[in-house]
A protein has these predicted regions:
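Conserved small/polar residues in nucleotide/adenosyl-binding loops
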Residues: 180-185
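Structural beta-sheet core signal
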Residues: 71, 102-105, 155
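N-terminal targeting signals for export/organelle localization
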Residues: 1-51
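Structural microenvironment flanking redox-active thiols in thiol-disulfide oxidoreductases
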Residues: 77, 81-121
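Short active-site neighborhood of thiol/selenol oxidoreductases, capturing the structured segment around
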Residues: 62-78
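Short, internal strand/loop/helix patches
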Residues: 103, 115-150
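Thiol/disulfide oxidoreductase modules built on the thioredoxin-like
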Residues: 135-176
Length: 190
């Protein structure tokens, strides 16, 4: 008799755990937010849909397994703070600095000369021209803020999916925590 009760308790414990946790989340006890400190896009999107001007290769290659911090520049004065912050976040990763790539996208021909100056100022940054502006359109549709006005930093995972962006008011230390808790860094100070 004791063995049957013990066996029943062992067999029912996992079922009860799953049942109670499901009920806990179903009846409104789920967490309100996430700890990523960013804002998820309405729908994540793959970057392999964006091609270069000749339509023969991807706008960005993701074969190196690096996380990507990006800014879409529409106004150089608005975006310079985001570009500088990307550099500071990259430097703050210390020995994991090579696990992150920084990319600046733009489509306005009037910014060509400013992009050359930007490349001189930040030599390790990759600058990509989105000739037809389709990336900007997709960013606008999938976000809750105006990418044209704000020029925020957005994150692309190593598989080529744009998953989140950061509001311009987000504390840089919180952004760094996301990079530390992802595969972009080995040591986690957060």
């Amino acid at each position: 008799m004791k063995n049957k009760i013990f066996l029943a308790a062992i067999l029912l414990t996992p079922i009860l755990v799953v049942l109670f946790s499901s009920m806990y989340f179903t009846f409104g006890m789920s967490p309100d937010g996430t700890k990523n400190n960013g804002v998820f896009f309405n729908n994540y999107f793959e970057f392999n849909q964006f091609k270069n001007a000749e339509e023969n290769r991807d706008l960005v290659e993701f074969e190196d397994g690096k996380w990507v911090l990006s800014v879409y520049v529409t106004n150089m004065d608005k975006s310079i703070e985001s570009i500088y912050l990307m550099r500071q976040l990259n430097v703050a990763l210390n020995r994991d600095i090579n696990k992150l790539k920084r990319i600046v996208f733009y489509s306005d021909n009037a910014l060509d000369i400013k992009m050359i100056d930007l490349q001189d100022q930040y030599p390790r940054i990759e600058i990509i021209k989105d000739k037809n502006g389709t990336l900007l359109d997709v960013l606008q549709v999938n976000s809750n803020i105006s990418f044209i006005k704000e020029n925020p930093i957005f994150v692309i995972d190593p598989y080529g999916r744009a998953v989140m962006y950061f509001d311009p008011e987000t504390d840089p230390k919180l952004m760094l925590c996301l990079l530390y808790t992802s595969d972009a860094a080995d040591d986690t100070p957060c």
